[in-house]
From Swiss-Prot:
This is Oleosin Bn-V. Residues 159-177 have a biased composition (Basic and acidic residues). It comes from Brassica napus (Rape). Keywords: Lipid droplet, Membrane, Repeat, Transmembrane, Transmembrane helix. Signal peptide: none annotated. Residues 48-119 are annotated as: Hydrophobic. One of its GO terms (cellular component) is monolayer-surrounded lipid storage body. May have a structural role to stabilize the lipid body during desiccation of the seed by preventing coalescence of the oil. Probably interacts with both lipid and phospholipid moieties of lipid bodies. May also provide recognition signals for specific lipase anchorage in lipolysis during seedling growth. InterPro entries: Oleosin (IPR000136). Residues 1-47 are annotated as: Polar. Residues 154-183 are annotated as: Disordered.
Length: 183
């Protein structure tokens, strides 16, 4: 008889069940399903029990934390009220000092990183981002050269026009002088 896909996968996965099914018809498969259902029910019960246990223990821990916090506030509130004129400025000072030290350290690390990058770039190593810097430098250089060429070109045109005007003015002046001398 031709084997179906189900037969092939069942025989490959469960060789004893396949043998039982071949010998006893569907009995082997039915027994597998019943034991699988029992297995899956017991597994679900184990999962539920584990979840309930974990949830209960977390609930107890959160309750203990809440009770501890309330007791600490009950004890600490009178002390905080009595010592607040001293504690508040002290806490502000400590917070400012900590902020200052942390920001100073962060700026120091940033400066060291920048100097390290500049050193690598200056010594010929190619740190990350140096290709973008080189590209920007080339673009800026080409724009500067373009502006220099334009300024030179327009300067030549402007100087040439003034030169032509001066020459025309001198020629007119020379003509008028020449006519004055001849008369």
């Amino acid at each position: 008889p031709a084997r179906t896909h189900h037969d092939i996968t069942t025989r490959d996965q469960y060789p004893l069940i396949s043998r039982d099914r071949d010998q006893y018809g569907m009995i082997g498969r039915d027994q597998y399903n019943m034991s699988g259902q029992n297995y899956s029910k017991s597994r679900q019960i184990a999962k539920a029990t584990t979840a309930v246990t974990a949830g209960d223990s977390l609930l107890v821990l959160s309750s203990l934390t809440l009770v501890g916090t309330v007791i600490a506030l009950i004890v600490a509130t009178p002390l905080l009220v009595i010592f607040s004129p001293i504690l508040v400025p002290a806490l502000i000072t400590v917070a400012l000092l900590i902020t200052g030290f942390l920001s100073s350290g962060a700026f120091g690390i940033a400066a060291i990183t920048v100097f390290s990058w500049i050193y690598k770039y200056a010594t010929g190593e190619h740190p990350q981002g140096s290709d973008k810097l080189d590209s920007a430098r080339m673009k800026l250089g080409s724009k500067a050269q373009d502006m220099k060429d334009r300024a030179y070109y327009y300067g030549q045109q402007h100087t040439g026009e003034e030169h032509d005007r001066d020459r025309d003015h001198r020629t007119d002046r020379d003509r008028t002088r020449g006519t004055q001398h001849t008369t």
